[in-house]
Amino acid sequence: MKQYGIQLGTLLFIMVEPWKGHEVEYNRWYERDHFYGGCMVGAYNFAGDRFVATRSLKELRYPADSPMTPEPSVGSYLAMYWVLKGHHDDWNRWSVDNVHMLHAAGRMFPERTHVHTVLYQHEWSLPRTLTGTPIELALDRDYAGLVVNVGELRGGHRHEDLEAWTREQWSPAAFGTDWGPDLVSYATPLPLLDDAPADVPRVANAERRFLQLHFCDHDPAAGWDDGYGRFGEQLEASGLATHLWTAPFKQTVFGTDTYTDELW
């Protein structure tokens, strides 16, 4: 696939749980203020999108015991932002300073919990076809669904080994199915700045952790039992990594309260 001048370098993955009774106002605050004021107005932040896990989608998450969430019902909203390659340090410094400014200005929303807020280094991506959607456009495409897969490398294995397994074994089979993804990306955790907000959890075993984002042009729950419901066992069977989490999300509907009554 031809490379153009805009390339994804790093990404911000923010999974949050609004406190019950505050979900509607949280949703409105986030998309009408924080989505833009917290990230999108920043230099080198070239894309962003929001996803939601309804109650029925959370029921598909596994395993129940995961470092990603304290329990499967937690982590209803996911926001992601793309940062231009070569400008992570510039963006990161601005981002931390900006969020402190928003706190001081009273523009934050205390009735919510950060479940998993982590910066990731984008490593590689794989579209279904050679002329498919590049990762740089994934958040602008409005994919109907997203499946998040998380794992940790086992001793003696490298991220390159898992890339080869995904490219050569898992993806060719999945791309040919109705439940399979249109685009797969792979990322590894980055450290937060020392003065990042204290309520943002840090990642354990970061050097072995990986995040796969599987963008789907269909309902992510479709064909679950034969598809993503087996991803964990397939990853474990590869011998390369320990499976930590698989979870489906769907697009939010900007400007509406859609899905706020389906979270729990």
Q: Where are the regions that the model predicts?
A:
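Macromolecular interaction modules
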Residues: M1-W264
